[in-house]
Amino acid sequence: MKLELKNLYKDFTVRNFFQKEKKSVLEDINLTLEENDILGLLGRNGAGKTTLLKIILGLIHPTKGSVIFSDKKDPLFGFANSNPRSFFWRISCKENLIFFGKMLGLTSKEIDESIDKLSDILGISDILDTPFMLLSSGQMQSINIARSLLKKPDLLLLDEPTTSLDYESSKRIIDTTKEYLKENKIPAIWCSHDHLELNRVSNKFGLLKNKRFTFSNSKIFKFHQKAINYEFEVINKDIDKIKLKLDIQITKLVNINQFFTVKDKNLDLDEFLRLLIKIDVKIISIEKNFNHFEDYIL
């Protein structure tokens, strides 16, 4: 399925005590998504990413412009964000998925087959019988994504799906979801304010900034994939392992964890992360070491 957005505008009416004001959120958005594309959409909080997804989903109407789906009159969407509140917390994950599968019109056999397939790819087999309320944030998000894929969608929309997750949980969700999309040839729009995440999963990139959408090629994203641009958090006992391999700068100490940056300007982030895995060091968090990546990209 091919998606086209043509000359899309979106305004909202903001009411205050004295008057109504028009607030422009999106202006002249033009976008083409081909079959099998995964578009990484970068933008700060409030840039309009969620608004754009809602327009594509048909939840809100654009002020002007058109949304065109070729080959599909009534496409099926998959959608996942970082909010787990739409699940039933006291029943098991499998019972949740069965309920939502029935809402999608799937038969019991189709639901079981879909859950089995998704369990293998997303690694959720061990938690299917666990009440949803007992899951970690990362596990909840895996179930959230499984729900969005229960019935193979024509287009998957992901709105900051790894927000608030630790590095390991984020990496697992990114890698498993990308594998499933590729295997099943499902196009997707993956929204985030984290360019590292988008660079791992996407073959196309775009930036929402100042109400407008701009395509960007992956080389611009990769240019900033140097370890020196990040601050890392690890537990105290792992710092000495890292010091044996690299020249680092300790930036702060919080409880039993230490934060540091690397000094090597030429060390790629991926190479650095592979080194940490090799020496058995687990990253607790990674933060960008400059103010706003969007200001550097274009």
Spans of model-derived segments:
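The feature captures the beta-strand-to-loop junction immediately N-terminal to the Walker
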Residues: 42-44
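Helix-to-loop junction immediately C-terminal to a conserved catalytic motif
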Residues: 57
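Conserved ABC ATPase "signature" region
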Residues: 98, 102, 110-127
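Conserved ABC ATPase signature
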Residues: 131-135
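Conserved catalytic motifs of ABC-family nucleotide-binding domains
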Residues: 152
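Catalytic Walker B motif of ABC-type/P-loop ATPase nucleotide-binding domains
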Residues: 156-160
